C-alpha cells in the first residue's frame, strides 16, 4: 500500500475553477484498479496553534493505492491526460509525497 499526498499550487484566485475540474475527475480515478482512496482537500481554518499557515491557492489530494504499479498506471490513464490539458493555466506546480506504512 502507498499513500500519496499531492500538493497542487493553483494560479492566484483560481482554486474554485480547478476544484470544478477536479470533481469531474474524481469518480474516474476512484474506479481505477488499485485505487483505495482519492479525494481533494483544502486547508482548514482552525484555532490550533501549531497548524501551518492556511494557503488559499493550494489544493491537496489525499490518495491511497494498492501498489506502485496501480499508482504508475493512474499517472498514465487517459482521463489524467485529459485533465492535465483542461487545467493548463490553472495549475502552477504539482509535487507528490509518496509514503509507505512504517
Model features per residue range: what roles?
Residues 39-57, 82-102:
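Glycine-rich beta-strand-turn "strand-cap" elements at beta-sheet edges
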Residues 2-9, 39-75:
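Short, well-ordered beta-strand segments in beta-rich or mixed alpha/beta enzyme
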Residues 11-13, 101:
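Generic structural motif
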Residues 27-30, 34, 70, 92-96:
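Generic structural signal for secondary-structure transition and capping sites
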Residues 1-2, 102:
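Absolute protein N-terminus
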Residues 14-40, 78-83, 87:
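Short amphipathic alpha-helical segments
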Residues 15-16, 22, 56, 68, ...:
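Generic N-terminal initiation segments characterized by hydrophobic and/or small/turn-forming residues
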Amino acid at each position: 500500500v502507498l499513500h500519496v499526498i499531492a500538493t497542487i499550487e493553483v494560479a492566484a484566485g483560481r482554486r474554485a475553477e480547478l476544484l470544478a475540474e477536479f470533481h469531474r475527475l474524481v469518480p474516474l480515478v476512484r474506479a481505477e484498479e488499485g485505487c483505495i482512496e482519492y479525494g481533494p482537500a483544502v486547508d482548514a481554518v482552525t484555532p490550533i496553534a501549531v497548524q501551518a499557515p492556511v494557503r488559499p491557492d493550494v489544493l491537496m489530494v489525499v490518495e491511497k493505492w494498492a501498489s506502485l504499479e496501480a499508482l504508475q498506471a493512474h499517472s498514465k490513464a487517459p482521463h489524467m491526460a485529459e485533465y492535465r490539458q483542461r487545467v493548463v493555466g490553472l495549475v502552477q506546480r504539482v509535487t507528490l509525497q509518496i509514503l509507505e506504512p512504517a
